[in-house]
């Protein structure tokens, strides 16, 4: 089945002498692993599409009994260049991608989480919002989508006792 879907590149790594394997989070199929044959050849321009933090449009051949799917076409949908200007934003954005990659299973669609991830990365591209707040927001959204939403309304928080700190100048965070 031929699939045409937007996707965010989570991770890519070399495979063999000239190929590349990319793990992408797509809107329709969730996390998918794609093989890009010949992407590491000198004349190929496909490797640049599969760098983490790229928002791309992909067309690939999806086979139900396989873990790796062969890519046929790719194009940029959006390029968030301002994230790369700030090392702190890059580290938080890559951490978000790593969280997404490690927590979601393959071919498990989460369209609402995809939209949230896209909006969070777009917000990282703008300089108006605190990067830590965006990171925490995405963590809560991810937990909510996975069914582990914390109940922050309960003031007692059972099982959690915080120590009394008299002088917080000696605390290391």
Set out the residue ranges of the language-model regions.
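Non-catalytic alpha-helical scaffolds and adjoining flexible linkers that form interface surfaces
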Residues: 1-20, 25-173
């Amino acid at each position: 089945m031929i699939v045409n879907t937007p996707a965010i590149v989570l991770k890519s790594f070399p495979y063999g002498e000239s190929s590349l394997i990319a793990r992408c989070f797509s809107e329709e199929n969730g996390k998918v692993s794609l093989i890009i044959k010949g992407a590491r050849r000198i004349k190929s321009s496909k490797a640049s599409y599969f760098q983490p933090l790229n928002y791309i449009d992909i067309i690939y051949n999806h086979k139900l009994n396989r873990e790796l799917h062969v890519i046929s076409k790719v194009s940029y949908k959006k390029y968030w260049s301002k994230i790369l200007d700030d090392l702190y934003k890059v580290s938080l954005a890559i951490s978000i991608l790593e969280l997404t990659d490690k927590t979601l299973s393959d071919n498990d669609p989460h369209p609402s989480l995809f939209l949230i991830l896209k909006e969070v990365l777009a917000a990282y591209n703008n300089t108006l919002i605190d990067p830590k707040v965006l990171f925490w927001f995405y963590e809560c959204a991810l937990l909510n989508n996975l069914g582990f939403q914390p109940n922050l309304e309960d003031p007692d928080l059972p099982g959690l006792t915080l120590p009394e700190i008299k002088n917080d100048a000696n605390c290391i965070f």
